[in-house]
Protein backbone atom coordinates (compact mmCIF):
# COMPACT_ATOMS: atom_id res chain seq x y z
CA UNK A 1 0.00 0.00 0.00
CA UNK A 2 2.82 2.38 0.90
CA UNK A 3 4.62 1.55 -2.33
CA UNK A 4 1.46 2.31 -4.32
CA UNK A 5 1.06 5.64 -2.54
CA UNK A 6 4.69 6.59 -3.18
CA UNK A 7 4.38 5.58 -6.85
CA UNK A 8 1.18 7.62 -7.24
CA UNK A 9 2.73 10.68 -5.64
CA UNK A 10 5.84 10.29 -7.81
CA UNK A 11 3.73 10.10 -10.96
CA UNK A 12 1.72 13.14 -9.92
CA UNK A 13 4.89 15.08 -9.15
CA UNK A 14 6.42 14.11 -12.49
CA UNK A 15 3.20 15.05 -14.31
CA UNK A 16 3.18 18.57 -12.89
CA UNK A 17 6.96 19.05 -12.88
CA UNK A 18 7.77 17.77 -16.37
CA UNK A 19 4.53 18.61 -18.17
CA UNK A 20 2.18 21.59 -18.14
CA UNK A 21 -0.03 19.62 -15.78
CA UNK A 22 -2.70 22.14 -14.86
CA UNK A 23 -3.29 23.06 -18.50
CA UNK A 24 -3.58 19.39 -19.50
CA UNK A 25 -6.16 18.93 -16.74
CA UNK A 26 -8.14 22.15 -17.16
CA UNK A 27 -8.86 22.02 -20.90
CA UNK A 28 -10.41 18.50 -20.88
CA UNK A 29 -12.34 19.39 -17.72
CA UNK A 30 -13.68 22.57 -19.34
CA UNK A 31 -14.74 20.61 -22.43
CA UNK A 32 -16.44 17.89 -20.36
CA UNK A 33 -18.22 20.47 -18.21
CA UNK A 34 -19.43 22.33 -21.30
CA UNK A 35 -20.60 19.10 -22.92
CA UNK A 36 -22.26 17.41 -19.94
CA UNK A 37 -23.26 20.09 -17.44
CA UNK A 38 -23.97 23.25 -19.42
CA UNK A 39 -26.79 23.92 -21.90
CA UNK A 40 -26.10 23.90 -25.62
CA UNK A 41 -25.80 27.33 -27.23
CA UNK A 42 -27.65 27.29 -30.55
CA UNK A 43 -26.62 30.75 -31.72
CA UNK A 44 -23.12 30.49 -33.18
CA UNK A 45 -22.52 34.21 -32.73
CA UNK A 46 -23.74 34.39 -29.13
CA UNK A 47 -21.30 35.55 -26.49
CA UNK A 48 -20.35 33.02 -23.81
CA UNK A 49 -18.81 33.76 -20.41
CA UNK A 50 -16.18 31.82 -18.50
CA UNK A 51 -15.40 32.83 -14.91
CA UNK A 52 -11.92 33.05 -13.44
CA UNK A 53 -9.90 34.54 -10.61
CA UNK A 54 -6.27 35.65 -10.46
CA UNK A 55 -4.28 33.15 -8.38
CA UNK A 56 -0.75 33.48 -6.93
CA UNK A 57 0.54 31.14 -9.67
CA UNK A 58 -0.72 33.64 -12.29
CA UNK A 59 1.39 36.57 -11.08
CA UNK A 60 4.45 38.15 -12.64
CA UNK A 61 7.21 40.04 -10.80
CA UNK A 62 5.02 43.14 -10.61
CA UNK A 63 2.24 41.14 -8.91
CA UNK A 64 -0.06 41.47 -11.93
CA UNK A 65 -1.52 38.62 -13.91
CA UNK A 66 1.25 37.37 -16.21
CA UNK A 67 0.64 38.34 -19.86
CA UNK A 68 0.95 34.71 -20.93
CA UNK A 69 -1.84 33.71 -18.53
CA UNK A 70 -4.35 35.71 -20.55
CA UNK A 71 -3.67 33.49 -23.54
CA UNK A 72 -4.02 30.37 -21.41
CA UNK A 73 -7.29 31.46 -19.81
CA UNK A 74 -8.61 32.42 -23.24
CA UNK A 75 -7.58 28.99 -24.52
CA UNK A 76 -9.65 27.25 -21.84
CA UNK A 77 -12.61 29.57 -22.40
CA UNK A 78 -12.39 29.07 -26.17
CA UNK A 79 -12.43 25.27 -25.82
CA UNK A 80 -15.57 25.51 -23.70
CA UNK A 81 -17.12 28.00 -26.14
CA UNK A 82 -16.55 25.83 -29.21
CA UNK A 83 -17.92 22.82 -27.34
CA UNK A 84 -21.14 24.49 -26.22
CA UNK A 85 -21.96 25.94 -29.65
CA UNK A 86 -21.30 22.57 -31.29
CA UNK A 87 -18.29 23.45 -33.43
CA UNK A 88 -16.01 20.82 -31.86
CA UNK A 89 -18.68 18.16 -32.30
CA UNK A 90 -19.20 19.13 -35.94
CA UNK A 91 -15.46 18.97 -36.58
CA UNK A 92 -15.36 15.50 -35.06
CA UNK A 93 -18.28 14.38 -37.26
CA UNK A 94 -16.45 15.69 -40.33
CA UNK A 95 -13.11 14.09 -39.34
CA UNK A 96 -11.57 17.55 -39.17
CA UNK A 97 -9.90 19.71 -36.55
CA UNK A 98 -8.63 23.21 -35.93
CA UNK A 99 -5.28 24.73 -35.02
CA UNK A 100 -4.53 28.20 -33.72
CA UNK A 101 -2.90 30.04 -36.62
CA UNK A 102 -2.67 33.57 -35.20
CA UNK A 103 -3.46 35.57 -32.11
CA UNK A 104 -3.00 39.08 -30.78
CA UNK A 105 -3.56 40.69 -27.41
CA UNK A 106 -4.22 44.22 -26.25
CA UNK A 107 -3.75 44.87 -22.54
CA UNK A 108 -5.67 47.82 -21.10
CA UNK A 109 -5.47 47.38 -17.33
CA UNK A 110 -3.79 44.86 -15.05
CA UNK A 111 -5.70 42.14 -13.24
CA UNK A 112 -4.45 41.85 -9.66
CA UNK A 113 -4.19 39.04 -7.11
CA UNK A 114 -7.54 37.37 -6.34
CA UNK A 115 -9.40 39.74 -8.67
CA UNK A 116 -12.44 37.97 -10.17
CA UNK A 117 -12.96 38.24 -13.91
CA UNK A 118 -14.89 36.75 -16.80
CA UNK A 119 -13.67 35.83 -20.26
CA UNK A 120 -16.33 36.88 -22.77
CA UNK A 121 -15.78 34.81 -25.92
CA UNK A 122 -17.63 35.20 -29.19
CA UNK A 123 -17.29 34.06 -32.76
CA UNK A 124 -16.95 37.12 -34.97
CA UNK A 125 -17.12 35.33 -38.30
CA UNK A 126 -15.31 33.06 -40.72
CA UNK A 127 -13.84 32.92 -44.19
CA UNK A 128 -12.89 30.05 -46.49
CA UNK A 129 -10.12 28.80 -44.16
CA UNK A 130 -10.64 29.93 -40.58
CA UNK A 131 -12.92 30.99 -37.76
CA UNK A 132 -12.22 34.32 -36.03
CA UNK A 133 -12.90 34.67 -32.33
CA UNK A 134 -12.61 37.46 -29.77
CA UNK A 135 -12.03 37.12 -26.02
CA UNK A 136 -12.56 40.01 -23.61
CA UNK A 137 -11.26 39.87 -20.04
CA UNK A 138 -13.82 41.76 -17.98
CA UNK A 139 -13.14 42.62 -14.33
CA UNK A 140 -16.07 41.69 -12.10
CA UNK A 141 -15.15 44.54 -9.76
CA UNK A 142 -16.24 47.29 -12.12
CA UNK A 143 -16.97 45.76 -15.54
CA UNK A 144 -13.84 47.22 -17.15
CA UNK A 145 -12.46 45.39 -20.19
CA UNK A 146 -8.90 44.73 -18.99
CA UNK A 147 -7.70 42.92 -22.11
CA UNK A 148 -8.93 42.08 -25.59
CA UNK A 149 -7.58 39.07 -27.47
CA UNK A 150 -8.24 37.94 -31.02
CA UNK A 151 -7.73 34.49 -32.55
CA UNK A 152 -7.60 32.92 -35.99
CA UNK A 153 -8.67 29.28 -35.65
CA UNK A 154 -7.60 27.53 -38.87
CA UNK A 155 -9.73 24.59 -40.01
CA UNK A 156 -8.02 21.45 -41.35
CA UNK A 157 -9.79 18.61 -43.13
CA UNK A 158 -12.84 20.63 -44.17
CA UNK A 159 -13.92 24.27 -44.40
CA UNK A 160 -15.63 26.62 -41.94
CA UNK A 161 -18.61 26.83 -44.31
CA UNK A 162 -19.09 23.06 -44.16
CA UNK A 163 -18.81 23.08 -40.37
CA UNK A 164 -21.50 25.76 -40.08
CA UNK A 165 -23.70 24.03 -42.65
CA UNK A 166 -23.35 20.75 -40.72
CA UNK A 167 -24.45 22.52 -37.54
CA UNK A 168 -27.30 24.58 -38.98
CA UNK A 169 -28.46 22.02 -41.59
CA UNK A 170 -28.47 24.78 -44.19
CA UNK A 171 -26.16 27.20 -45.94
CA UNK A 172 -25.33 30.20 -43.75
CA UNK A 173 -23.63 33.32 -45.03
CA UNK A 174 -20.81 34.55 -42.76
CA UNK A 175 -21.45 37.87 -41.01
CA UNK A 176 -19.69 41.04 -42.06
CA UNK A 177 -16.38 41.19 -40.23
CA UNK A 178 -15.62 44.26 -38.07
CA UNK A 179 -13.30 46.81 -39.64
CA UNK A 180 -10.52 46.33 -37.07
CA UNK A 181 -10.62 42.56 -37.62
CA UNK A 182 -10.26 43.09 -41.37
CA UNK A 183 -7.12 45.15 -40.73
CA UNK A 184 -5.71 42.39 -38.53
CA UNK A 185 -6.41 39.75 -41.20
CA UNK A 186 -4.70 41.97 -43.77
CA UNK A 187 -1.69 42.34 -41.48
CA UNK A 188 -1.43 38.56 -41.11
CA UNK A 189 -1.61 38.04 -44.87
CA UNK A 190 1.07 40.65 -45.50
CA UNK A 191 3.30 39.13 -42.83
CA UNK A 192 2.83 35.67 -44.35
CA UNK A 193 3.77 36.91 -47.81
CA UNK A 194 6.94 38.57 -46.49
CA UNK A 195 8.01 35.46 -44.57
CA UNK A 196 7.31 33.19 -47.55
CA UNK A 197 9.36 35.49 -49.78
CA UNK A 198 12.26 35.44 -47.29
CA UNK A 199 12.14 31.65 -47.20
CA UNK A 200 11.77 31.19 -50.94
CA UNK A 201 8.33 29.64 -50.46
CA UNK A 202 6.26 32.21 -52.29
CA UNK A 203 3.87 29.58 -53.68
CA UNK A 204 3.15 27.94 -50.34
CA UNK A 205 0.32 29.19 -48.14
CA UNK A 206 0.46 29.44 -44.37
CA UNK A 207 -2.23 27.92 -42.23
From Swiss-Prot:
InterPro entries: HotDog_dom_sf, THEM6_lcsJ_thioesterase. Disulfide bonds: none annotated. The keyword Glycoprotein applies. The modification Phosphoserine is found at residue 199. Keywords: Glycoprotein, Phosphoprotein, Secreted, Signal. It holds the Pfam family 4HBT_2. Glycans are attached at residue 188. Transmembrane segments: none annotated. Residues 1-21 form the signal peptide. Its main location: secreted. One of its GO terms (cellular component) is extracellular region. It is found in: Secreted. The keyword Glycoprotein applies. Belongs to the THEM6 family. PANTHER family: PROTEIN THEM6, PTHR12475. This is Protein THEM6. It comes from Mus musculus. The gene is Them6.
